[in-house]
Amino acid sequence: MAKYTKEDIINLVKENGVKFIRLQFTDIFGTLKNVAITDKQLEKALDNECMFDGSSIDGFVRIEESDMNLRPNLDSFVIFPWRPQQGKVARLICDVYKPDGTPFEGDPRHVLKRANADAKELGYTMNVGPECEFFLFETDENGRATTNTQDKAGYFDLAPTDLGENARRDMTLALEEMGFEIEASHHEVAEGQNEIDFKYGDALTTADNIMTFKLVVKSIAQRHGLHASFMPKPIFGINGSGMHVNMSLFKDGKNAFVDENDKNGLSKVAYQFIAGLLKNIKGMAAVTNPLVNSYKRLVPGYEAPVYLAWSCKNRTALIRVPAARGAGTRVELRCPDPSSNPYLVLACLLQAGLDGIKNNLQPPAEVEANIFAMTEQERKENGIDNLPNNLYEAVNYMKENELAKKALGDHVYGNYVAGKAAEWDDYRTKVHDWELENYLNKY
């Protein structure tokens, strides 16, 4: 049941003195976009009459077919708590439509809605709980980000060593005021690294929340004179930032991953879901780990998952099944990072899990040993493959994965692969500091 009507939104804007409304949407590479309107244009926007030029957005459309229409999701209305009390700013998350009234196939939100519809046909809905890590960096005198962390704290440390505590507290308060249910907020393993966990929700709500979360974290950090970065590996030699994704399927109001008679407490559906993820993850890594930099995080030795295996306890495996059982039974995929587009990530992961269910796939045996300590020969003997080593490999695996194409649709798939291939080529042809340090004086 909808929380707000059109009239509710108009009244809330008037009663709260809102003067500006951001109509937000996301491009295929996960960048948040918005069209800002004044309160005078609100009714027009709520009547789905707000147009924008889609040819200016990465991966959307060509200039000759550029007209796009924004349709606000009324229940996403929220007032930004950190903006001025005079002339407040609110936002509405929008779906992108074509002028003929059909959903735009290049809208990441639409991609996830299609995946949800496929799950619904089988009687399932997916709940998701993300764990978003980020760094807080100092800025220079011009306000530009540095890689100087403002503390030397470690996992679960607190003030005075955790100098990000005040910023993290204000982020938490702002998120709660915007309707988030915050479950935990703490310093992470690396210096300057933080994590704020919020309650799980259905896949679409969670993807919306991840985009909102990143906006709030960056905005509040800026007010503290800091820069919040969701770059996966900004500093060599310390842990990078991940976005572990916890997933469960529900059917008829019950967790479909539960079987109390199984030795692990897992149902046949849970094992099939795990098998589908393991089968397809290499072909979807360019989505879950979309940057050149993403693969600097995915190396052994920094708690990041590299090897394709699953376990109930073993954190060196790509997929872990946390200890909670009953309604809390879930599967945790540990490779995604927070630079990814959450709509595309969840669409791909859901379709991969459904692929396992539809085709009755079975996962390999659980791996309980420390995979990082295994030799290459031992991993080979145990049938343990690894994720792509870089974005180039990930893009090539994606080109071979039919399910990734199905999950994203032709439009997003084609533009995404082309964009990531170009990104790798741009990186490949640049001269980097490492080359200068090692070669300039030597040769």
From Swiss-Prot:
Location of the GS catalytic domain: 108-443
GO MF annotations in UniProt: ATP binding; glutamine synthetase activity; metal ion binding
Cofactor binding comment, as recorded: Binds 2 Mg(2+) ions per subunit.
Binding site for Mg(2+) 2: 133, 188, 195
Binding positions for L-glutamate per the UniProt entry: 239-240, 297, 303, 315, 334
Compartment(s) where it occurs, according to its Swiss-Prot or TrEMBL record: Cytoplasm
SMART domains given in the database record: Gln-synt_C (SM01230)
Cofactor: Mg(2+)
Site (Important for inhibition by glutamine): 62
Binding annotation for ATP: 183, 248, 315, 320
An example Gene Ontology biological process: glutamine biosynthetic process
InterPro entries (alphabetical): Gln_synt_N, Gln_synt_N_sf, Gln_synth/guanido_kin_cat_dom, Gln_synth_cat_dom, Gln_synth_gly_rich_site, Gln_synth_I, Gln_synth_N_conserv_site
Domain named GS beta-grasp: residues: 16-101
Catalytic activity field: L-glutamate + NH4(+) + ATP = L-glutamine + ADP + phosphate + H(+)
Family statement drawn from the similarity comment of this UniProt entry: Belongs to the glutamine synthetase family.
Cited function: Glutamine synthetase (GS) is an unusual multitasking protein that functions as an enzyme, a transcription coregulator, and a chaperone in ammonium assimilation and in the regulation of genes involved in nitrogen metabolism. It catalyzes the ATP-dependent biosynthesis of glutamine from glutamate and ammonia. Feedback-inhibited GlnA also interacts with and regulates the activity of the transcriptional regulator TnrA. During nitrogen limitation, TnrA is in its DNA-binding active state and turns on the transcription of genes required for nitrogen assimilation.
NCBIfam families cross-referenced by the UniProt entry: GlnA
Subunit structure: Oligomer of 12 subunits arranged in the form of two hexagons. In its feedback-inhibited form, interacts with TnrA in order to block its DNA-binding activity.
Full protein name: Glutamine synthetase
Organism encoding this protein: Clostridium saccharobutylicum
Encoding gene (name): glnA
